[in-house]
Curated annotation (Swiss-Prot):
Name this protein carries in UniProt: Cytochrome b
GO cellular-component term (any): mitochondrial inner membrane
Name of the gene encoding the protein in the UniProt record: MT-CYB
Lineage: Eukaryota, Metazoa, Chordata, Craniata, Vertebrata
Subunit description: The cytochrome bc1 complex contains 11 subunits: 3 respiratory subunits (MT-CYB, CYC1 and UQCRFS1), 2 core proteins (UQCRC1 and UQCRC2) and 6 low-molecular weight proteins (UQCRH/QCR6, UQCRB/QCR7, UQCRQ/QCR8, UQCR10/QCR9, UQCR11/QCR10 and a cleavage product of UQCRFS1). This cytochrome bc1 complex then forms a dimer.
Keyword Glycoprotein belongs to the record: no
Principal subcellular localisation of the protein: mitochondrion
Membrane-topology annotation of the record: Multi-pass membrane protein
Species the sequence originates in: Sorex antinorii (Valais shrew)
């Protein structure tokens, strides 16, 4: 008799995706982040669902409802901080997942990579709208500043901004629609993640060497299920430690002050995971130019596969490219630091230099270095 998991219409989909899936025998812990992102998404949807039961998306009561969740709801404080810090964990896993893709040449699977870029945009949009919901000072002013960027679009800009606001400023209509979008987007993200996985399983996983691994495959279960469970346990350990010991470590104190349209905070800045893009935005004195640079700083990932000039897929055997990759990582960390600093000397010039280096490395320096490495190997 054939095994039920291989014949049942629903179970055979799960079987071919998570049980009998042929996987390369040499994939390292850098391949754990896909499953960790899935776990993060589940945590966010569940905690978000319970928060939505008590939250009210009205400018008069939003801040109070969040306070009520933390003070009066059973374990409300835990759910709220799991959700807030879960977002940080989500982005840590996202950045490491994308970094792995860049290092090992996973971007050569075009469909998988492009859906991944789309997922990154969707998660960033969701996180931005979620940050507005508590209706603190930084929520309100962050929403005002970021939505106002659309006014840089020629001709339709100002109309577009007012359309998104639902009025002449960030107000009740804005908060209500942001809550609606923040609720629906994670389910769209889950669907996109399914498509991401579908395309990945069409080709099979890449591996650290970047070579074809068809000759050496092992079943996903039990080898990688056990490995993924270890990763999940470490993720939960890190998240619970953060939530229980220092839940406000990554937040902004200004968000504990209710939103006040008449009082601007001294330094408006987004959550830490947007600081690198915010630094690129601020480093260009022109409004439209800044907005374009902001969008391109993420959209540039979609161009990376077309800039691959090396004869080898992975950076595993390319020391010069490895060096440049880690310079890029250091550059992004520098941009993250600059994004959180006030707009004054010397931070302005450091931000501008780091922004130029970011685009130069990806668009010019790394492709040229790959060609140089080809010549070194007489390829």
């Amino acid at each position: 008799m054939t095994n039920l998991r291989k014949t049942h219409p629903l179970m055979k989909i799960v079987n071919s995706s998570f049980i009998d899936l042929p996987a390369p025998s040499n994939i390292s812990s850098w391949w754990n982040f896909g499953s960790l992102l899935g776990v993060c998404l589940i945590i966010q949807i569940l905690t978000g669902l319970f928060l939505a039961m008590h939250y009210t998306s009205d400018t008069m009561t939003a801040f109070s409802s969040v306070t009520h969740i933390c003070r009066d709801v059973n374990y409300g404080w835990l759910i709220r901080y799991l959700h807030a810090n879960g977002a940080s964990m989500f982005f840590i896993c996202l950045f490491l997942h994308v970094g792995r893709g860049l290092y090992y040449g996973s971007y050569m699977y075009l469909e998988t990579w492009n859906i991944g870029v789309l997922l990154l945009f969707a998660v960033m949009a969701t996180a931005f709208m979620g940050y507005v919901l508590p209706w603190g000072q930084m929520s309100f002013w962050g929403a005002t500043v970021i939505t106002n960027l659309l006014s840089a679009i020629p001709y339709i800009g100002s109309d577009l901004v007012e359309w998104i606001w639902g009025g002449f400023s960030v107000d009740k209509a804005t908060l209500t629609r942001f809550f609606a979008f923040h609720f629906i987007l994670p389910f769209i993200i889950a669907a996109l993640a399914g498509v991401h996985l579908l395309f990945l399983h069409e080709t099979g996983s890449n591996n650290p060497s970047g070579l074809c691994s068809d000759a050496d495959k092992i079943p996903f279960h039990p080898y990688y299920t056990i490995k993924d469970i270890l990763g999940v346990l470490l993720l939960i350990l890190a998240l619970t430690s953060l939530v229980l010991f220092s839940p406000d470590l990554l937040g902004d104190p200004d968000n504990y002050t209710p939103a006040n349209p008449l009082n601007t905070p001294p330094h408006i800045k987004p959550e830490w995971y947007f600081l690198f893009a915010y630094a690129i935005l601020r480093s260009i004195p022109n409004k439209l130019g800044g907005v374009l640079a902001l969008v391109l700083s993420i959209l540039i990932l979609a161009v990376v596969p077309f800039l691959h000039t090396s004869k080898q897929r992975s950076m595993m055997f390319r020391p010069f490219s490895q060096c440049l990759f880690w310079i890029l990582v250091a550059d992004l960390l520098t941009l993250t630091w600059i994004g959180g600093q006030p707009v004054e000397h010397p931070f302005i010039i450091i931000g501008q230099l780091a922004s130029i280096l970011y685009f130069l490395l990806i668009l010019v320096i790394m492709p040229i270095t790959s060609l140089f490495e080809n010549n070194l190997l007489k390829w």
